[in-house]
Each structure stands twice: as C-alpha cells, then as structure tokens.
Amino acid sequence: MNANNSPEDDGSSLAPETKEPCPTKLPPSLRNELKARAASLAPPRTLEEVFSEALGAWAEEPEEPNTPPVKLTGSIPFTTMLPAGQWSLHKKVCSARGVTFAQGAARAVRRWLEDHPEAWTVRHPGKIRRIIVCNQKGGVGKTTVSQGMGQAAAEGAAYLDEVLTLLKRNSLKNKELIERIEQAEASELRVLLIDYDPQAHLTKQLGLEVLPAKGPSLAKAMLGHLEGSLADLVVPLTDARFGGRLHVLPACRDAFLLDAGLAGHRSRSHALETALKPLENDYDVMIIDAPPSLGLSMDAALHYGRRRDGESKGQSGCIIVVQAEDSSADAYDLLLEQIQDLMKDSGVPIELLGLVVNLYDASRGYIATSSLEGWQTMEEIRCVGVVPDLKEVREAVRLRIPLFTHDPVSLQAIELRTTWKEIS
C-alpha cells in the first residue's frame, strides 16, 4: 500500500482500447450535476469521460482525514462504460480506504465537481422570470412553444452565430431570416422547463422518462407529501448548444389527481409557488408547460406567474398559445375569463405577456388567414409569434430530441427565437 492509501501497481494497466461496464449507484442530484457540468465544459464532454476521469483522480490522490461521506439516500443504479480494469482498480482503492464502492464513486464525483466549478452562474440573481404557457384547449402546441422558448433562452452565442453562418451559405439566402438572426442575441440563461401537464408531452418529446406515480414529484411537493428535494428530480439536457443551462422537471402521472388534492389544501393558490420557491435561486427563467385545464392546478400556476411586489412589468406572466381557427378563440375566451376572475378574487396582477399563433398554414385558406389577422389586431394582448406548421417539429418529436438540436436553422426554430426576443 502506498502513502496515498491506494494499492500498489500490480502490473494490470488500464486498456483504453477496450471498455467494460461499471455497475454502481449515485444520488440522482449528483449524477445530474455531473452530467450538466460535463456538457458545460469547452469543448463539451460526455458523462462517461468525466466519470472515468473522476475515478482516476480520486484513486491517485489521498483523501483528507475524516473526509465526510456523501449521503447516498435515494441513490439509483448507474451504469456506464469504463476503460478495462478501471472499475477493478476502483474497488481496490475503496477496500483500502474502508468505504463501499458506491461511496467511493460518489466521493470521486464530488471531488471532481469541486475541482471543476461552474463556468457560469445565474445571470440575473433575484430576478427570476416565471412564464406560464397556457390555453384551456389541448393540441394547440403549448409544449412546442414552451420548449422552443426555453431552448432559445439557453442557447449559446457560438451556436447562434453558427445558425447565421448556415443561413448566409444557403443558396436561397433569405434576407429577412438573416436579419432576424442578426438582431437576435444569445441570452445564455439558466432555464428550467417544468412539465406541469400529466399527459407528459414535454417530458416524452425531449426523450426523458416520466416520473413513477408512487415516487417523488412536483404534485407531491405541492401537496406537502414530498420526501427529499425537488431539485433531485431535475434533469439537464446535454446538447452542447445549451451549455448545461437547460434543465427539465419531468411530469408524473400523479398530476391527474392534483386538482382533487388541492381541493382540500388550505393554501392551494400558493401550492405551486411553495414547491418551486427553493429552486428559484438556481435559474434565470422558469417556463411552465401548463395542462389544458381550468381547474385548481391552473389557478395555482396563474398565481405563481403573477407580478410580485418589486418586479418590473413584463418580467413574469402568461403566454397564451392558439391556432388560427375558431375553436381556439372560444378556449382563449374561457382562459381570459379565468385569469380575470382570479385577479378580481385575489387582487394580484397577472400579465398577458403575449399570444403565439402556432401551427399556422396560410394554405388552409380564409379561415386561417382571417383568424391570424384577428389575433394580430387584438387590443388586450399582442401577438409575439407565429410558428408555421412544418415537418421539423414533428420530426424532432418523433426522434425525442429538442428542435434546436434536430434543425436549428428551421423556420420554426427561427420563429421561436423571435418569440423569445419579443418578450425579453
């Protein structure tokens, strides 16, 4: 045994050309933080790469006496591929230091995170924007708009420059689109997308797993039944264009029962705010993909999106998504009535940040074109975006990846960047 509490080299060198599985467990929060930190590096690195590096560094360097253990409560299975022999070496180091294999892995990850601090932080501390994307009608594309604005808010400057370069190289060279990207600014904000809809469209469309009904969830946090931290459920999206800044709070099927639970809750209008408040200091923007509902859960979302004392106008509020057809107008009227009733009953200001017309197709004729004109000339709310009905969003949904990952130069992606700029 050497002075570093690591076993002597027994001649079994690691073989980087071959890989073997490493079965262990990590707390979800630690795994997610490692994944996000890896994606935020320049150039971005994979979870497999940084985990291997963390184990290697921990094996080579001694631990301080009385190093506190990492809490492994709620750990879940975690398997990745390591260079052949590295996991065996890790087990020897753990045995020498008197810790379990999982505890050793967690300590290695913790040390790596400490040695590789975040290169960016919340840009506007204390000024969290809370945006509720809503409509009582289902199928209008609230999820498309929610995740599109989130992607636009988190996108890195280098990737926006790349979009501009690609547009200029395009043989068509659409001057209007080029000008719009030239006028856009990469926000590079830290964003949390919250799937508040029990149908879990946002979660599934981004390739994430829906939370199990009997496990921890946002609904349980709202009802005061959550054991642990809501932060442990947050999942980072690892596409390098978002720099580790875009996170998702997945949906859970138990949200179908949320309205019934809120009916007997003493502070039901504050329930969502109470649940999400501990996360606010970690983000610049929270975007809530709301369900097609006029129930108590929607009341809680609208209350959360109100303008708080001291907040500037336009900082938080509602984005209403519609289509260029008559049934969307009926649903809009119902939602507007709910918002007005809530403001009257509670005395809180709820701002209408804008209207987004989604799935627009002028080829559908007079109904579509006249409806669009009606939306664009409304007095009580301004139209901040018109997203066309094109194949790229459907392709991204089928592939279960973000639209900006699938086709960052698509007209839909450009329109969603414009929408975000309009409300920024």
Mark where each language-model region is.
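P-loop NTP-binding core
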Residues: N2-A15, E20-C22, N32, A36, ...
